[in-house]
Amino acid sequence: MSTGDSFETRFEKIDNLLRDPKSEVNSDCLLDGLDALVYDLDFPALRKNKNIDNFLSRYKDTINKIRDLRMKAEDYEVVKVIGRGAFGEVQLVRHKSTRKVYAMKLLSKFEMIKRSDSAFFWEERDIMAFANSPWVVQLFYAFQDDRYLYMVMEYMPGGDLVNLMSNYDVPEKWARFYTAEVVLALDAIHSMGFIHRDVKPDNMLLDKSGHLKLADFGTCMKMNKEGMVRCDTAVGTPDYISPEVLKSQGGDGYYGRECDWWSVGVFLYEMLVGDTPFYADSLVGTYSKIMNHKNSLTFPDDNDISKEAKNLICAFLTDREVRLGRNGVEEIKRHLFFKNDQWAWETLRDTVAPVVPDLSSDIDTSNFDDLEEDKGDEETFPIPKAFVGNQLPFVGFTYYSNRRYLPSANASENRSSSNVDKSLQESLQKTIYKLEEQLHNEMQLKDEMEQKCRTSNLKLDKIMKELDEEGNQRRNLESAVSQIEKEKMLLQHRINEYQRKVEQENEKRRNIENEVSTLKDQLEDLRKASQTSQLANEKLTQLQKQLEEANDLLRTESDTAVRLRKSHTEMSKSISQLESLNRELQERNRILENSKSQADKDYYQLQAVLEAERRDRGHDSEMIGDLQARITSLQEEVKHLKHNLERVEGERKEAQDMLNHSEKEKNNLEIDLNYKLKSIQQRLEQEVNEHKVTKARLTDKHQSIEEAKSVAMCEMEKKLKEEREAREKAENRVVETEKQCSMLDVDLKQSQQKLEHLTENKERMEDEVKNLALQLEQESNKRLLLQNELKTQAFEADNLKGLEKQMKQEINTLLEAKRLLEFELAQLTKQYRGNEGQMRELQDQLEAEQYFSTLYKTQVKELKEEIEEKNRENLRKIQELQSEKETLSTQLDLAETKAESEQLARGILEEQYFELTQESKKAASRNRQEITDKDHTVSRLEETNSVLTKDIEMLRKENEELNERMRTAEEEYKLKKEEEINNLKAAFEKNISTERTLKTQAVNKLAEIMNRKDFKIDRKKANTQDLRKKEKENRKLQLELNQEREKFNQMVVKHQKELNDMQAQLVEECTHRNELQMQLASKESDIEQLRAKLLDLSDSTSVASFPSADETDGNLPESRIEGWLSVPNRGNIKRYGWKKQYVVVSSKKILFYNDEQDKEQSSPSMVLDIDKLFHVRPVTQGDVYRAETEEIPKIFQILYANEGECRKDIEVEPVQQGEKTNFQNHKGHEFIPTLYHFPANCEACAKPLWHVFKPPPALECRRCHVKCHRDHLDKKEDLISPCKVSYDVTSARDMLLLACSQDEQKKWVTHLVKKIPKNPPSGFVRASPRTLSTRSTANQSFRKVVKNTSGKTS
């Protein structure tokens, strides 16, 4: 600034700086500075200085008054805490005076200064305050006190996208919409010159209409002129961080806005797949996958992801040099994934979102998680002994969006001369402010009405769909009714036929009964004569045969009668079922008609609500256009209803039972149409009246503004004339006043333009009202025509009623006929039962008479019974032998039970021995008897011991035999396979050799022909016949070649099939072998347990020597451990949690059972060889940062060779190839660069190795998991000890296990550490069948070596 400028211009520039909200010395900033000074100086130690004490005594009271007048936290009511982070929390608040709802973010000043290198609160404030973008959360106010920074933002009631993804399976259509909105939001931030650096679903919030806005700009950073950023700290969330940001840790990080597009790719993948693409349980695992993204990025096979989506994800998740979006946002917008018919990039904000949140009130927090109260003590600034300036970094943070700044310096100087001008200006400003507020409120109302209109349209569409579905159901029901009536007629016809058959059968039965009665008479006569002669016996036999034949006939007839009865009952049941179906269908039809009428009523009510909402929006011309479209749609619906009525009436003629309901529908439709027309007329009249009122109100406002303007202009002109004559020095001031007037003129012109726009809208609305009136007249004419048609249809309905009555009478007659038939059937059944009783009596008499004739047969029967008894005895003997075999097979189970009983006996004996030692002084004789008893029990136990040892030896032999069989089978299989392969090779080589010989022969023949002299001499004189012969020969050769090729291809296909079959057999045999090995392992552990018990028994029962307790404990084998542990379910703790398994650790194996039943059946799900164990250790927070903090002390890790694993379900997993993780070799270590955001210490210098936001560059060995600072290697310091692990990491696997408590974890770790072999397991052959179930875990992270209680490293 030049010193030649006048004081007025200087003061004017100072005034502009004070009024500018972006200036560093505006009024709020100066007030913040005074407030901060008072806060920082008001301490007893500092007030000893006189200058400070004088300053405080001068300004402290005024600053306290200013604090009371400025915005503070007490101005808001806290509704609920909706979020909590590292620096503070987010509260849902309501302003006490305005009752408006906001989201207020609290940031702790102590935490900000403590982590000043990672706190970007200025960027967050500036972006939200000055963005003016619909894609960024708006900041209304920012203020502070001595402990917190406060940011009052707009409340987003839809929650974040994490909540949406947890509640819905996001389809690709939704993913396209939300990804497009994220792209536009990031473009808005990039256009302001910032990079977000922490794009994730947690920072994407949904407003009340379901649209997305970005939030949490605490990691944003300002770009330089080249659009790049320099940063040496890795900022962001591990799953979403880009490779170039990871590389910036500890080095010269230089990257641009493309790091945000990487996070967008991760977000899109997570929406479509359900998990992040580089998921791992440990931080090192995620970071190594991100750095090796070319090989680790894969898509699951079970997800239907389009090619365009995969292409977009791969274009985002690639190197920054070729990443999509590096050259601008337009190349992202042009991608094929975003092509659709629903929305365009320009109208994306106006389209209806896929999910619109259902809100009960303005403070609805159903889309946010309930948070527990923060009971931790808050850290505050300590009382200083010298000046620290803790409040100075936050000077200028205060911001008010609607702040009216101080008037200009010129205006303050002219107060004495222009009081009237000031009052006029204030009045004009108030009126303009009121008009702006009205405009803002009307725009908000417009937006709300548009949203309501959209929701009501959606509801209308749903209702129309439901009406169509109900109409289709009604048609289906009517067709079903007609089919049922046809079936009913057919059944009645069948019933008549069956009745005729029943009558015929009854006649036959009567004739047969008469014949039976005659036969009975003849039998009685023959019985009397049988006592006198043998001839009568022969006749008796003949009569018996005849009787039997008659009985057979009777049985057949009775069977036929029973069948007829069954068929009759079935027919009656079917008739009753059909009648019930008919009734149900009629009831359903009635219910459907009622539901249709209710739906129509709801439809008209919704229309009334719609029109009421449109009536409130009379000032908007767009909604009147919607009204016109709705009226035309209503006309089309009336036409559609008319066609429906005609169709329904045509169907009513066929379906006679639905006539009454159709009349009700017609009446309802007439009433609804009349009501609809009246309501439309009333609404139109109300809209016209409201337009007149608004027009009058606007004209009054316009006149008042014009009058105020004219008065102000006259007075200003007078004052200007007076001041020109009186003061020439005040020209600059007059110029300023003229500028203000011109500004007011511009405002007035804008308001006039708005008024003209409103009047034009009003005229348009009046024209549209006229058009609506014409359309109403047309609809009234159509209504008269419809009434006439309805009358004709009512006449036809009366005719159909008469026909329905006739049909009902016919149905009643059929029902009466049915009842008569049922009565006749009941009588026939009674007669049949009486005949059956008579037949039984006759059969009893026959049996009594036949008793004498069957005496001679009894001897034969006795002989047969004797033979049968012998056979039974033989069968019993066979069964006894089989039971003996079964007992032999169950000797193992009996041996186990015996061992348990012998343990109990041993305990009893020990108790008896203890009592005997006490009573030995009193009764020596008793002692001797008890010793003899004990000797007997010992001998008995020794016998059982010998039996058990024999059984164990037998089992061992069987086990060895099984192993030998398995080996021989494997060797035979390998030999067979090698022989087949050799045979195939030999056959192929023969074919190749034959083809080669044929080829050489043909070439030789051609050479001979070419080298012949005759051929050379007569080359020019060659005849056409020779050429034809050669062509024939060539064709023959080609045919032979083709035949040979076909044969060869057939042979290849055949051998390929055989190979596939052999491979399938190999897989089956491998699975069977795995199962057998697992069962053998479980059996071996059981045998081992039995041996331990036997040893205990043998030691306890040795009476001769009684060793001390210490000696016995020393001689016992190491006890095994078993119990419940949890294993990661499907390898993903975050998504699927833990799975409980029963684990048994024996001397050689670790067995995993799904439950105790599997343990009893000896079928483990997984077996690990203890010989293949590398390492056992407790985990740290960095290893399993996805697990709960309470679970981390209970988790431990097992590291083992992958050939030592045997699983029940073998899953062939693809081995990842080409993975090249960057690691540094140093003293046998393989160091991987990493970062620790959780507590960890360097094992070389014992200094902290972690930080929440800016961790130092670190290294971790992927073998022994030693952690150290990267500087130790860079500076070549000899502080790191050599690596103690010598196994190959690529051949190793790890497993996480969760114990029930921390003590259990320690117990398992100490026990397994003792089991680790001193010599590490050797490498394995990768072609072995067991490697089918292994998976590549080269990038798995394992942490530091845990020290054992004895001091040795585990």
From Swiss-Prot:
Residues reported in the UniProt entry to bind ATP:
I82, G83, R84, G85, A86, F87, G88, E89, V90, K105
Instruction: Enumerate the residue ranges of region (Disordered).
Output: 1333-1354
The AGC-kinase C-terminal domain extends over 341-409
Report quaternary structure and partners: Homodimer. Interacts with RHOA (activated by GTP), RHOB, RHOC, GEM, MYLC2B, RHOE, PPP1R12A, LIMK1, LIMK2, TSG101, CHORDC1, DAPK3, PFN1 and JIP3. Interacts with FHOD1 in a Src-dependent manner. Interacts with PTEN. Interacts with ITGB1BP1 (via N-terminus and PTB domain). Interacts with SHROOM3.
Q: Where is this site: Cleavage?
A: D1113, G1114
What topology does it adopt in the membrane?
A: Peripheral membrane protein
Spell out the protein name for this chain.
Rho-associated protein kinase 1
What this protein is reported to do is described as: Protein kinase which is a key regulator of the actin cytoskeleton and cell polarity. Involved in regulation of smooth muscle contraction, actin cytoskeleton organization, stress fiber and focal adhesion formation, neurite retraction, cell adhesion and motility via phosphorylation of DAPK3, GFAP, LIMK1, LIMK2, MYL9/MLC2, TPPP, PFN1 and PPP1R12A. Phosphorylates FHOD1 and acts synergistically with it to promote SRC-dependent non-apoptotic plasma membrane blebbing. Phosphorylates JIP3 and regulates the recruitment of JNK to JIP3 upon UVB-induced stress.
The PH domain, residue ranges? 1118-1317
